[in-house]
């Protein structure tokens, strides 16, 4: 394989630029030319494709977002869109593609491979909801961003004896809420993977204040419901204290990636090039127990999010990823909670 391309698709995530940089520089070291595709699959179909050099990715490793831009392009789910994209790739003499994104992006990569065009997927999403990897590119940075915000919210919450509901991203997965909540010492963490009763949340809040606490922080994963809906249900369940809602929103996607995300993205990007160099497509690169692994992109894209296959201790956990179950139990123990 003498010429490959790289694109980013779906929601942006810190560390995508680091992954692109690794793809470009590793490929050049292997004697492979690299082309960038702007705006994901939309740019592929439109022919928005251009050569990348080592200088093109200089000083990009510490930048958030993606300099190749990103977009959602539902038309690529249709065969016509897929074939149009492949036709453009062939015009540029491209023989393989590295796709950086979430599960929607993986479906596109899977379709390319089914049409005989090798594609390798890299998990780029803050949600950490990709099967086949313990961690996704951007997750660590997003958690750090949320922890910083929670620390600040605690300051103002304590000053006014307030209860805060802090809504965080994650789509249908509670990984951001769970990890950031524990790291910030949140009082309650509510995630889609674990059922809870609002009456018990109210009891936890009231008990905290009775013991002398001057604030209460609830971290809410967006996959449960919106922060405003949650606040309304808390009041319906009997909570009468001062209650505010903070929605962190897209700030969680931005910012300079952490060292962990930069290293993870660099390792994955380099591995993707090695796979394409060897003529291997239709796989996604992941990390398990700090070791890089590959899994069929078909299974990765079709299996769905974490915590989806089995039920253990009331939490749906997608084996072998057990971090969610362990962390949820840890939070309950540290805060002596009973949300069930």
Swiss-Prot record:
Q: Which organism is it from?
A: Lactococcus lactis subsp. lactis (strain IL1403) (Streptococcus lactis)
Q: What is the lineage of its organism?
A: Bacteria, Bacillati, Bacillota, Bacilli, Lactobacillales
Looking up Pfam families in the UniProt record yields: PFK
Q: Which residues bind ATP?
A: 11, 72-73, 102-105
Q: What pathway is this protein said to act in by its record?
A: Carbohydrate degradation; glycolysis; D-glyceraldehyde 3-phosphate and glycerone phosphate from D-glucose: step 3/4
Named cofactor requirement(s): Mg(2+)
Against InterPro entries, the record matches this protein to:
ATP_PFK, ATP_PFK_prok-type, PFKA_ATP_prok, Phosphofructokinase_CS, Phosphofructokinase_dom, PKF_sf
Family stated for the protein in its record = Belongs to the phosphofructokinase type A (PFKA) family. ATP-dependent PFK group I subfamily. Prokaryotic clade 'B1' sub-subfamily.
Major subcellular location class: cytoplasm
The active site annotation covers 127
| Coiled-coil region | none
GO CC, sorted alphabetically, is: 6-phosphofructokinase complex
Localization per Swiss-Prot or TrEMBL: Cytoplasm
What is known about what this protein does? Catalyzes the phosphorylation of D-fructose 6-phosphate to fructose 1,6-bisphosphate by ATP, the first committing step of glycolysis.
Assembly and oligomerization: Homotetramer.
Q: Which UniProt keywords are given for this protein, alphabetically ordered?
A: Allosteric enzyme, ATP-binding, Cytoplasm, Glycolysis, Kinase, Magnesium, Metal-binding, Nucleotide-binding, Transferase
Q: What's this protein's name?
A: ATP-dependent 6-phosphofructokinase
Tell me which residues bind Mg(2+).
103
UniProt-annotated binding residues for ADP: 21-25, 154, 185-187, 211, 213-215
Q: How is its activity regulated?
A: Allosterically activated by ADP and other diphosphonucleosides, and allosterically inhibited by phosphoenolpyruvate.
């Amino acid at each position: 394989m003498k010429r490959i391309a790289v694109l980013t698709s779906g929601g942006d995530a810190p560390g995508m630029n680091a992954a692109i940089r690794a793809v470009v520089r590793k490929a050049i070291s292997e004697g492979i030319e690299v082309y960038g595709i702007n705006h994901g699959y939309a740019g592929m179909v439109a022919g928005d494709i251009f050569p990348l050099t080592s200088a093109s990715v200089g000083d990009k490793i510490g930048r958030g977002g993606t300099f190749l831009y990103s977009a959602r392009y539902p038309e690529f789910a249709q065969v016509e869109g897929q074939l149009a994209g492949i036709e453009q790739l062939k015009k540029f003499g491209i023989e393989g593609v590295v796709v950086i994104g979430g599960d929607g992006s993986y479906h596109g990569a899977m379709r390319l491979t089914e049409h005989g065009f090798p594609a390798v997927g890299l998990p780029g999403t803050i949600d950490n909801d990709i099967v086949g990897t313990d961690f996704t590119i951007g997750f660590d940075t997003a958690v750090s961003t949320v922890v910083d915000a929670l620390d600040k919210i605690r300051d103002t919450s304590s000053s006014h004896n307030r209860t805060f509901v802090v809504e965080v991203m994650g789509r249908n997965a509670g990984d951001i809420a769970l990890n950031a909540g524990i790291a910030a010492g949140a009082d309650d963490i509510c995630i889609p993977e674990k059922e809870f009763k609002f009456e018990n949340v109210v009891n936890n809040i009231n008990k905290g204040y009775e013991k002398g606490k001057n604030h209460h922080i609830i971290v809410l994963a967006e996959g449960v419901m919106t922060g405003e809906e949650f606040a309304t249900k808390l009041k319906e369940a009997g909570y009468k204290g001062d209650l505010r809602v903070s929605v962190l929103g897209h700030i969680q996607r931005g910012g300079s990636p952490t060292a962990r995300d930069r290293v993870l993205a660099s390792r994955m990007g380099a591995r993707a090039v090695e796979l394409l160099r060897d003529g291997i497509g239709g796989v996604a690169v992941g990390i398990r127990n700090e070791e890089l692994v590959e899994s069929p992109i078909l299974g990765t894209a079709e299996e769905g999010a974490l915590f989806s296959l089995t039920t253990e201790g009331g939490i749906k956990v997608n084996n072998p990823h057990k971090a969610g179950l362990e962390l949820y139990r840890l939070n309950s123990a540290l805060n002596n909670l009973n949300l069930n």
